[in-house]
Amino acid sequence: MKTKTDFLKMKEQGEPITMLTAYDYPSAKLAEEAEVDMILVGDSLGMVVLGYDSTVPVTVEDMIHHTKAVRRGAKETFIVTDMPFMSYHVSLQETMVNARRIVQESGAHALKVEGAGEVISTIQYLTNAGIPVVAHLGLTPQSVGVLGGYKVQGKDAESAKKLIEDAKKCEEAGAIALVLECVPMQLAELISEQLTIPTIGIGAGQKVDGQVLVYHDLISYGVNRVPKFVKQYTSVQEEIVRGISQYVTEVKTRQFPEEKHSFTMKEEECLVLYGGKQ
């Protein structure tokens, strides 16, 4: 399993880091088989697999539950778990309780938190306690209401400079990596050059140290539309619908199950069962 040291070395050597979200045992198992470097159990699971309109309703218990499943499916892959909405915007003591629960109960190797400002002290606090932290800047979904929607961040020089400053503060606080979401590629490149920790981009162009995509977006599974930054490498959704539709048809027309899908009794047992009448 790769560790923080390996990811730093990959950045130094110019080897891109691959990160993929996974929310359950089968997706984690497949991600590990595909040799993904890092798995993110994102609170995006609220929208992707739980059907919420945002990530806000996701709880600490949800994150623990899903991370445990991912851990069972990917025992040899570094796993990062999101701290959900309002689980770390409380006192540092309450934040530690939530962080401890997620790490101890789920088996996550690191936690991810969004934003800067007061979150910087949280990064430092968790790091000092021995919990690796991944920072997240740019479009931060938990704050989408404050940001005015799902929009690209850092498009003007002033806001771009603020993001650069925040990125440096995250590194200084002890973050082991930084996710940059929906920022101009020029800004992402500049931030990547000025940090010693790896940057993982999602909608941040190619000049970052790694990329992350949502599993379901990448394979077109259960999604109707995807953001501009997503490349769909295959479409399992069409095959799944086709297969289920065929199943429905065959059941309705009594083509399924066939004899090869059924179990039988010996003829003499049937005679006993039917009282000698068939």
From Swiss-Prot:
Enzyme class, broadest EC rank: transferase
Catalytic activity entry: 3-methyl-2-oxobutanoate + (6R)-5,10-methylene-5,6,7,8-tetrahydrofolate + H2O = 2-dehydropantoate + (6S)-5,6,7,8-tetrahydrofolate
Binding positions for Mg(2+) per the UniProt entry: 43, 82, 114
Cleavable signal peptide: none
Locations listed in the record: Cytoplasm
Cofactor(s), by name: Mg(2+)
Gene that encodes it: panB
Upper taxonomic lineage: Bacteria, Bacillati, Bacillota, Bacilli, Bacillales
Gene Ontology cellular-component terms listed: cytoplasm
Catalytic residues of the enzyme: 181 (proton acceptor)
Native source species: Bacillus cereus (strain B4264)
Pathway(s) where this gene product acts: Cofactor biosynthesis; (R)-pantothenate biosynthesis; (R)-pantoate from 3-methyl-2-oxobutanoate: step 1/2
GO biological process, one term: pantothenate biosynthetic process
Disulfide bridge positions per record: none
HAMAP family assigned: PanB
UniProt-listed SUPFAM superfamilies: Phosphoenolpyruvate/pyruvate domain
Location, primary (coarse class): cytoplasm
Record protein name field: 3-methyl-2-oxobutanoate hydroxymethyltransferase
EC number of this enzyme: 2.1.2.11
